[in-house]
A protein has these predicted regions:
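Sequence context surrounding c-type heme c attachment/ligation sites in exported
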Residues: 1
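Short Asp/Glu-rich motifs
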Residues: 31-33, 93-94, 129-130, 200, ...
Length: 230
């Protein structure tokens, strides 16, 4: 997608009042800076909260001076970011010898600067990521490792990266979440806290859609086979 194409995308989004999601700067090249143009256009048109830059891997290759200057503009625009950690760690940096780049955008810095960022997966068992299965808990597990976001505070809040932050990106916060009057769409994980859910790789034990169970799992039963375990 060239510069003219991005102008056209924004023009159409404004005309028809639509959301924008651009696969942007999915490259290790630090000079790939289409996100700068997207940010500028979203500020001019006032559509930042409706605009999402996906991947932005090149932000992981640029120097800090440029990156933190852009953070101010991202926040001013109200831009959303989507990172696909499993795909990006697999696809990016393949041409590097060593040191080898991780290929991820600056998730931690975006998060710490109050910019909306979420995790996703855009490849399901395809050539770009053969192991993709749509399990966002697995994506989150990979993402917080690669982005080095594993302090107690970060792990206590990291489920936001695959829940409320994604809802904000999709502009559905008004119908998302566990609140009276909102659709009952959620999954249940076998954990007592967010930290435990992530740390223990908690299993999904139920899924509810529009108030109806899609599935429920029976509790796992263990049998002690030795005196030590009894």
């Amino acid at each position: 997608m060239c510069i003219r194409d991005r102008h056209k995308v924004v023009e159409l989004a404004v005309k028809y009042d639509k959301l924008i999601d651009v696969h942007c700067d999915e490259s290790d090249d630090p000079m790939s800076r289409f996100v700068e143009l997207l940010t500028a256009l979203s500020i001019v048109e006032g559509i930042g909260p409706k605009t999402t830059a996906s991947h932005t891997c090149s932000l992981g290759s640029v120097d800090n001076s440029y990156a933190f200057r852009m953070m101010k503009n991202f926040k001013k625009a109200g831009l959303n970011f989507i990172s696909c950690p499993t795909e990006n760690i697999y696809l990016q940096g393949r041409q590097d010898t060593y040191p080898k780049r991780r290929g991820l955008t600056r998730v931690k810095e975006l998060y710490e600067n109050g910019i909306n960022v979420c995790f996703a997966q855009d490849s399901i068992q395809d050539p770009w990521y053969p192991a993709g299965n749509g399990n966002l808990m697995n994506v989150l597990d990979n993402g917080i490792h690669i982005a080095q976001m594993m302090s107690f505070e970060e792990m206590d809040n990291c489920l936001d990266l695959i829940t409320v932050n994604g809802a904000k990106t999709m502009n559905i916060s008004d119908i998302y979440g566990i609140e009276a009057g909102k659709p009952a769409n959620f999954i249940v994980v076998d954990a007592r806290s967010e930290f435990e859910a992530v740390c223990e790789r908690a299993d999904v034990v139920a899924s509810v859609r529009n108030g109806e169970y899609l599935f429920k799992k029976a509790p796992v039963a263990f049998e002690a086979l030795s005196e030590f375990m009894a």
